[in-house]
Amino acid sequence: MIYFDNAATTMVKPRCVIEAVTQAMQHMGNSGRGTHGASLGAARTIYDTRKLLADFFNAEKATRIAFTANSTESLNIAIKGLFAPGDHVISTVLEHNSVLRPLYELEKKGVRVTYAECDEKGAIRPEDILKYVDSSTRGIVCTHASNLTGNMIDIARVGAAARKAGIIFVVDASQTAGVIPIDVQEMNIDVLCFTGHKGLLGPQGTGGLYVREGVEIRPLLSGGSGVQTYSREHPREMPTALEAGTLNGHGIAGLHAAVEYIMETGIDNIRSAERELMLRFYNGAKEIPGVRIYGDFDTEERCPIVTLNLRDYDSGEVSDELAFGYEIATRPGGHCAPMMHRALGTVSQGAVRFSFSSFNTADEVDTALDALRELAGGED
């Protein structure tokens, strides 16, 4: 199989990730639940991964990183734990349902939400967001990059303006963590939500959030914590406040190995390799008769995603043809991004997304282009 569905999850992982998970499953106990070696070893692995991620994102300290199962959980914790009736929150039409659905729930409870519009290429500039700031604006919640088009938002500019205005800035880094360098302090990010199984190259079931010192989030869950057993309330100190229950220690061990791999390989080297593959595919696909490509490719600031449609064919049918006729994996349909599809006019057709990893090759890209030419009936 040629795998071009890396924006959904990176299937090919570094060997060290697989080995770390295997070792953890054989030797890891439950962190914070005992003083025996297996429990202490788990605690050490979890702390070391917390510290590694803090360094990776330039967080103030390791305790500002809390682990979750994925970005969806992180975003629910942040959105539902920060805002209250009467608040005004600004978001965008680029968002995934993991942002939109929690916001829809808050709207029903009296939170006012404004969604910044995009241009014809699906791009949003900082001023498109910031123009909606008013005296009641409590937060800005936006993606770093669209999972549909790969278009990025200049979060450093948004963050600087938000910090100056005293507005909480929450960033969904699902598509960029591990792919694009992120410095939470330099970019003035108050809460960064990330998943481990995409660009970070870790196992599914891992994720987390960075919370800036001084930002208080109401916990979404309460329960076992391993500390303060006799208190009726869940501990309020980070990161325990946001980590009720047993953590995915096995997955976190794999995430540690994955982040180490990225740091050793160099995130800029990974980004360059993925960009080269994306442009190779884009430059070939745009010349195929009947292919319509979405997104802004006039800027270097984008994720390695090319989303397209072929004539008026249903995106699911095209993706099925690629999968069963050519063994090429892509993602069709709505991509959990309803507002973005409405903006692009692709609600009924959906779109076929090709997303690239540094583990892909130029030969695989060329094979996919040949397949598209055949499906388009426009062979050279």
Language model: regions and residue ranges:
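Pyridoxal 5′-phosphate
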Residues: 1-380
